Amino acid sequence: MTYKKTTAVIFEKPGKLEVREASLRAPAANECLVESDWSGISTGTERLMLTGEMPSFPGLGYPLIPGYETVGKVVESPDGSELRPGTHVFAPGSVGFTDARNLFGGSARHIICPEDRLIPLPKKLGSEGVLLALAATALHALRRCEQKGPPELIIGHGVLGQLLARLTRIIHGTIPTVWERDPARRPAGLDYAVYDACQDPRHD
């Protein structure tokens, strides 16, 4: 039974994207209805889903609604929940669409998410809140290599590379070197060095 109609980004099939109406079921007793303000776009996973190049895994199919980096505000929440309506949250996707696969379902105006998967955010973060998932990935990577010490070299200066470099400075107080081939990703004025690999003065 349809609980709510909303607007969503939908990959109808490989190579075909539409923005159209989608149907949500009613939230379960442990779920919240969230109104989205922003949703990040993954240039890896979601691009592969759009082009049809994503390796098969259980649940993959079309049509699908992408999005696992959503920031919005709670509209409805369970009785007694600390996430009251109006609370700004990060959501790693949606579980509630009935006419498209939720992979991962966050790129829609309204989404349904289990309460325990929502992370409250300061309102002032705004659209920058969508970086939470990538920041968590970077932090997890740094924690996994703690026994070996902080990274001296980071390869790639995309969003994840930038987060790794900045978190290395914050957590370890050390300055990493970053290799990046694309000149557009080597801006001036950073507090760490970004080189084309062949221009790095270190050769060890």
Where are these regions (language model features)?
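A short acidic, Gly/Pro-enriched loop at the edge of an enzyme's catalytic core
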Residues: 30, 199-204
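Glycine-rich beta-strand-centered segment in the early N-terminal region that forms part
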Residues: 25-41, 53-95, 124
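Cytochrome P450 core scaffold surrounding the K-helix E-X-X-R motif
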Residues: 43-50
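Conserved hydrophobic/aromatic beta-strand scaffold that supports enzyme active sites
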Residues: 19-24, 71-73, 88, 110-112, ...
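Mid-domain Rossmann-like dinucleotide-binding core that forms the NAD(H)/NADP(H) cofactor-binding site
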Residues: 128-198
